[in-house]
A protein has these predicted regions:
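Bacterial N-terminal signal peptides
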Residues: 19-30
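Bacterial N-terminal signal peptides that target proteins for export
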Residues: 9-19
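Short, Lys/Arg-enriched N-terminal segments with co-localized hydrophobic residues
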Residues: 1-8
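Carbohydrate-active catalytic/glycan-binding domains of CAZyme proteins
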Residues: 31-384
Length: 384
């Protein structure tokens, strides 16, 4: 028996040594003769230049085209995406002549985040109260379209926040509509916040969160005129908890009265137990880019990765998206104003527009996966 055991051990050792020798040879061969990486062509089935489909009667073929300031939520097994009234080569007269059901706030849906169908428009017209406020306080200007919608569910009701403004002014109106369906019809519920040239803030770009830790509701909004603000909402109504409350400052930047800052998007990461505030810097048609801060509470204070408070008069980092171009492609500008969605499995996605260079007039939806690094900061995938 001892001799047999010895022979078995001897064979085992020899086999191990032979295996290690073969492994070493394999390593030497692989190191001495590396295989060159050969990329597999993966042509884009959709043309980035959609000029040929830009006529109003082609609206059912737009898919990811003509998307600006997107907000996305998954409802059941369907993703719904709402976006600003921004259409390349828009012509309301042609739309009317060809019976295009042109309205306000584009609504799309998808099963896979790749193939999108344009459902239509949320509203048949701009709410009269918003039009009256803006034009009365902006010398008859503005209120020609609806910007930056945001969708959130409360019990069995969907709440759609939106803004109406006069471009380049602080005269703006954030309104609320509700529906039993994400596709409408929508019932107007009134004004959340409205501003004019006398107020320090600008009532545009709403983003709303229900704090999962406290049940309180908060809306983040604003732009470069006075910065970004956070105001508490009444969960029962979706409007401000206190009448005529504008909230408190949460973000601005260096040269904040001149350099662009807008488009807050607030989310909660339950794994990190942090609230992330995504914001957009710079002109929307050129160097538009997304940055981010984080906080322990949805109302702030929000700090960047260097520990700077976003409401200080500094420029904050990191930068998550910016204009770029890959070889063989004209590139993208205006890659900002994002919406963010968290899947039940913990995966995160960012949605934003990109403007096709060099004219920067064609607007296409970009969807990227978000990853959080070891230090708890988000980064986004290079693929769209």
């Amino acid at each position: 028996f001892p001799q047999r055991l010895f022979m078995d051990m001897k064979r085992l050792i020899i086999n191990r040594l032979v295996g290690l020798g073969l492994l070493a040879v394999g390593i030497l061969v692989s190191c001495s003769a590396p295989t060159a990486f050969v990329p597999v062509p993966s042509p884009n089935p959709w043309a980035d230049d959609y000029t040929a489909l830009s006529s109003m009667e082609n609206y059912k073929q737009w898919g990811t085209y003509n998307v600006h300031d997107p907000a996305c939520k998954k409802i059941g097994d369907t993703y719904y995406l709402y976006s600003t009234d921004a259409i390349f080569a828009e012509n309301k007269e042609v739309a009317k002549q060809k019976n295009v059901p042109l309205g306000y706030i584009q609504v799309r849906k998808s099963k896979d985040l790749v193939n999108w169908d344009l459902v239509g428009w949320a509203f048949p017209e701009i709410p009269a109260e918003a039009v009256n406020w803006v034009r009365t306080h902006a010398e008859g200007q503005g209120a020609t379209n609806i910007w930056a919608p945001y969708i959130i569910k409360h019990n069995d009701v969907y709440r759609l926040y939106y803004c109406v403004s006069a471009f380049g002014k602080k005269t703006s109106y954030i309104g609320l509509a509700e529906s039993a369906s994400p596709e409408g019809p929508w019932i107007q519920k009134g004004c959340v916040v409205k501003t004019d040239e006398q107020t320090p803030m600008n009532a545009i770009d709403p983003s709303v969160i229900e704090d999962p830790q406290t049940g309180r509701w908060w809306m983040h909004y604003g732009s470069y005129f006075g910065g970004l603000f956070c105001v508490e909402l009444n969960p029962a109504t979706g409007l401000t908890r206190q009448k005529n409350d504008y909230g408190h400052l949460i973000a601005r930047r260096a040269n904040y009265k001149k350099d662009n800052l807008e488009a807050p998007e607030i989310i909660f990461n339950p794994e990190l137990k942090k609230y992330f505030l995504f914001v957009s810097y710079d002109p929307l048609m050129t160097t538009y880019n997304v940055r981010v801060g984080r906080a322990d509470k949805p109302e702030g204070p929000f700090l960047d990765y260097a520990g700077h408070d976003l409401k200080d008069t500094t420029n904050n980092f990191p930068i998550l998206t910016a204009p770029y171009a890959f070889e063989g492609h004209p590139g993208w500008a205006g890659t900002a104003h994002c919406g963010v969605w968290r899947e039940e499995n913990g995966r995160y996605y960012m949605f934003h527009q990109g403007r096709l260079s060099p004219e920067n007039q064609l607007m296409v939806l970009h969807t990227r996966e978000i990853f959080f690094n070891a230090e708890g900061w988000p980064v986004v995938s290079p693929e769209r």
